[in-house]
Amino acid sequence: MTIYAFYIYSRKCECVFAHRWKPSDRNSMETLVSQLEQNSIEDDMEKLIFGVVFSLRNMVKKITADQDQFMSYTTSKYKLHFYETPTNLRLIFITNPKIDSLTHVLQQIYTTLYVEFVVKHPLYTHVPPSAEEGGINCEIFRITLDRFVRTLSCF
């Protein structure tokens, strides 16, 4: 498994959706412990990811004339893939560093999954991320996203 996480940030810089994939070969006790540890640092992780993306994107804007130059960055442990929509919605994948660019996949997720299952969904109501169960709380979007990502050759 080489895709670790997917995030959506609003134009107000708030994480409105997060989905993580965990390796399936761990035993249940290790999984439970890691989930408890992860829940305590989720909010900080989401803020740190956005801070890094925001800083790098601004630096790239100052260096280059093209506004859409920043698409990914790589460390020794992970690679971050970035796509920003015309409405300033930001989609991010965290993957294995050896994966090629997934910007086209992020665009596809936005146009086929997000627009269809969140924007056009007649029963979906937006809840601000600051609320207890805030952000994108649409189960059909989460399930379809999970199925779509699992079909990718890099998963």
Curated annotation (Swiss-Prot):
Part of the multisubunit TRAPP (transport protein particle) complex composed of bet3, bet5, trs20, trs23, trs31, trs33, trs65, trs85, trs120 and trs130. May play a role in vesicular transport from endoplasmic reticulum to Golgi. One of its GO terms (cellular component) is TRAPPI protein complex. The lineage of its organism: Eukaryota, Fungi, Dikarya, Ascomycota, Taphrinomycotina. This is Transport protein particle subunit bet5. InterPro entries: Longin-like_dom_sf, TRAPPC. It comes from Schizosaccharomyces pombe (strain 972 / ATCC 24843). Keywords: Endoplasmic reticulum, ER-Golgi transport, Golgi apparatus, Transport. It is found in: Golgi apparatus, cis-Golgi network; Endoplasmic reticulum.
